[in-house]
Amino acid sequence: MSSNSFGKLFTVTTFGESHGPAIGCVIDGCPPGLALDAAEFAHDLQRRATGKSRHTSARREADEVEILSGVYEGLTTGTPIALLIRNTDQRSKDYANIGQQFRPGHADYSYWHKYGIRDPRGGGRSSARETTMRVAAGVVAKKWLAERFGVTVRGYLSQLGEITPAGFDWSAVKDNPFFWPHAAQVPELEAYMDALRKSGDSVGACVDVVADNVPPGWGEPIYGKLDGDLAAALMSINAVKGVEIGDGFASAVQKGTEHRDLLTPQGFASNHAGGILGGISTGQPVVASIVLKPTSSLRLPGPSLDTSGNVVEVVTTGRHDPCVGIRATPIAEAMVAMVLMDQALRHRAQCGDVGTITPRIPGQFDG
């Protein structure tokens, strides 16, 4: 298996390279009857797109989706949905000098040893360009989850370098290019990124994703845990080096009396577990966080090796993001939505008729 497919019942297979003629995906397992047209993909794809601010790559792609199959008269048919986006703004000449060199911190060296051949143009298959189709598939998952269960999946940038939000307001996230939840800090972020870009360096970031209204019961024990699937899905995103569910690694310094999420008739008293216990959703918000490393595509020279083992000096030209975390928010949202839809369908297949006499308590109360 080449691992280009994701999911068990709701499956997504992506294809294409950064500088190839097109990228695409095939979505299988989407239930029939979901209203869907090409225009619905535009919003999230533009949120992910490059060239929208001076703080991201200058590459400009239209990212217009062509629906090739699986939709008839505006409704999904239950058959595979094939989506295609044509690449129109490749500049492969920017990579002419590194075809035989290994860029430090990139997948060049590992791809070379695995396949014995690699596409150096923009990173080929290892480029974040591939995530465009994940966002497209996420649009389908988000819509189905919202219509079927009222589930919403939202994300925001929770750290940029050493800067963290001084406040939080969901309404601020959509109004700035950083997906930052505190509008008053945006000028600080602008100044920080301007200085970083001038220096030729890059920086890491963190993104948080929150899924609200997830019903209790989604996820499977042991090898199909909801948090396990979320971790695997989020770790598959380019540059992600760590995943937390709920309080994550902060749990190491908490006492049990603090970390346990007490149940009351009014709701859970806290959500340290991130809405998942035993690998199964509790009805609380599902909360996941990712950390993204600083990109290694730098204008600053660094020593490396070529394919013959000779020492070379590598300078990465081309158009790159000084912080890949800025555009990662819609990608992380898409992966969370895809996991939730897959788990929802899996739950319905085995336990759709299960009912309990225990009343469903609210996700959390402010007590």
Swiss-Prot record:
Co-factor requirement: FMNH2
UniProt GO cellular component terms: cytosol
Keyword Lyase: yes
EC numbers on record: 4.2.3.5
UniProt pathway annotation: Metabolic intermediate biosynthesis; chorismate biosynthesis; chorismate from D-erythrose 4-phosphate and phosphoenolpyruvate: step 7/7
Pfam families in the record: Chorismate_synt
GO MF terms, alphabetically ordered: chorismate synthase activity; FMN binding
Cofactor note: Reduced FMN (FMNH(2)).
Gene3D superfamilies for the chain: Chorismate synthase AroC
CDD domains: Chorismate_synthase
Binding residues for FMN: R125, S126, S127, N238, A239, G278, K293, P294, T295, S296, S297, R319
InterPro entries assigned to the protein according to its UniProt record, in alphabetical order: Chorismate_synth, Chorismate_synth_AroC_sf, Chorismate_synthase_CS
Reaction it catalyzes: 5-O-(1-carboxyvinyl)-3-phosphoshikimate = chorismate + phosphate
Keywords (A to Z) from UniProt: Amino-acid biosynthesis, Aromatic amino acid biosynthesis, FAD, Flavoprotein, FMN, Lyase, NADP
Signal peptide start and end residues: none
Keyword Transcription regulation in record: no
Binding site for NADP(+): R48, R54
PROSITE patterns: CHORISMATE_SYNTHASE_1, CHORISMATE_SYNTHASE_2, CHORISMATE_SYNTHASE_3
UniProt record, GO biological process: amino acid biosynthetic process; aromatic amino acid family biosynthetic process; chorismate biosynthetic process
Family designation: Belongs to the chorismate synthase family.
Subunit structure, interactors included: Homotetramer.
Record function comment: This reaction introduces a second double bond into the aromatic ring system.
Protein name as catalogued: Chorismate synthase
Protein's organism: Stenotrophomonas maltophilia (strain R551-3)
Annotated gene: aroC
